[in-house]
């Protein structure tokens, strides 16, 4: 007979969560979809003519962008011929230096690096992450918002956040025209708490850039990239337009990251039957190809999607590891709680 205590615990909402059945055709699978391409590359006269089983005649915008700018072609064929299990072991081996691995990982195709991390369990990925992170010292970011967009409260909370040790602070707005007030309040409050804190205001991208140009923010992060072409074009974007936006920030010396996360293509309905991790790998390669120094990923606000299927959280850690392995600063993010989706 089961005790009443365990019956009561089992009925709690937190214990009602469980995995749902994978839906491969719609990309509702975290890792190793049968529709994921096999790793391959062919280079003719310094140009990629085949990428992950797809000839250049069938490339979409993302394939073209990655093939031209995202892969170190000097060692690509050598690395693609290496055993993926051996490469996975090198990633988590503390005796193999990061400086030895980055030239290899940056010469892989998206499908190859996904194959490599798919051989690793969570503990091995954690060990690899300690070694592969691009940032010298890990740090924390805080969100500073309130329901009424009250700039005085934002400034006060920002000061406390800075005093408590947060090196980056982000705010956003419900009404776009309030953005300058929120951005300035966050900037002033954070510097009162502790000089040197970086601040951002998450908005529609043109407005966000304008705030940076005016000096109201110190950096930007919410410049979204996606792993399939239909999701890009649905937002009137291409990898090239995102690259142009990145160069606009760079022209004023503003730090910026792209943002992506596994599950976004599933939510938008354009996953093309690929796994969430493979599509996220394409996002990471777009970031590398655009010359951006870092990426906010880790499923972010889509976390309820990968966490609902088997190996979902493992895939989220894997995308963070891929980001760091491509020598990008990884801002690991989870903006939502799994049980709220």
Regions found by a protein language model. Name each.
Residues 1-157, 163, 168-341:
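Anaerobic metallocofactor- and corrinoid-dependent redox/one-carbon enzyme cores
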């Amino acid at each position: 007979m089961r005790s009443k205590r365990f019956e009561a615990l089992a009925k709690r909402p937190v214990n009602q969560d469980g995995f749902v059945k994978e839906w491969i055709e719609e990309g509702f699978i975290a890792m190793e979809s049968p529709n994921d391409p096999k790793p391959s590359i062919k280079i003719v006269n310094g140009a990629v003519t085949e990428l992950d089983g797809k000839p250049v005649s069938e490339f979409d915008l993302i394939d073209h962008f990655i093939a031209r700018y995202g892969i170190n072609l000097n060692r690509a064929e050598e690395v693609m011929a290496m055993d993926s299990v051996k490469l996975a072991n090198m990633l988590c081996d503390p005796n193999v230096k990061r400086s030895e691995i980055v030239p290899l990982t940056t010469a892989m195709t998206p499908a190859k690096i996904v194959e490599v991390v798919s051989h690793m369990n969570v503990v091995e990925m954690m060990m690899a992450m300690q070694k592969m992170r691009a940032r010298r010292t890990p740090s924390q970011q805080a969100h500073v918002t309130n329901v009424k967009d009250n700039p005085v409260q934002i400034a006060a909370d920002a000061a406390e956040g800075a005093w408590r040790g947060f090196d980056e602070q982000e705010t956003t707005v419900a009404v776009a025209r309030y953005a300058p007030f929120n951005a300035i309040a966050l900037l002033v409050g954070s510097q009162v708490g502790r000089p040197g804190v970086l601040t951002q205001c998450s908005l529609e991208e043109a407005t966000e850039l304008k705030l940076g140009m005016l000096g109201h923010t110190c950096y930007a992060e919410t410049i979204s990239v996606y792993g399939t072409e239909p999701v890009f074009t649905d937002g009137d974007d291409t990898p090239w337009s995102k690259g142009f936006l990145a160069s606009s920030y760079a022209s004023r010396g503003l730090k910026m990251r792209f943002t992506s996360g596994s599950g976004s293509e599933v939510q938008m309905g354009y996953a093309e039957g690929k796994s969430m991790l493979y599509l996220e790998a394409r996002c990471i390669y777009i970031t590398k190809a655009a010359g951006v120094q870092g990426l906010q990923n880790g499923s972010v606000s889509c976390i309820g999607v990968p966490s609902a299927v088997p190996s979902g959280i493992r895939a989220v850690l894997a995308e963070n590891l891929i980001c760091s392995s491509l020598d990008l600063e990884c801002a690991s993010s989870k903006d939502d709680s799994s049980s709220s989706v």
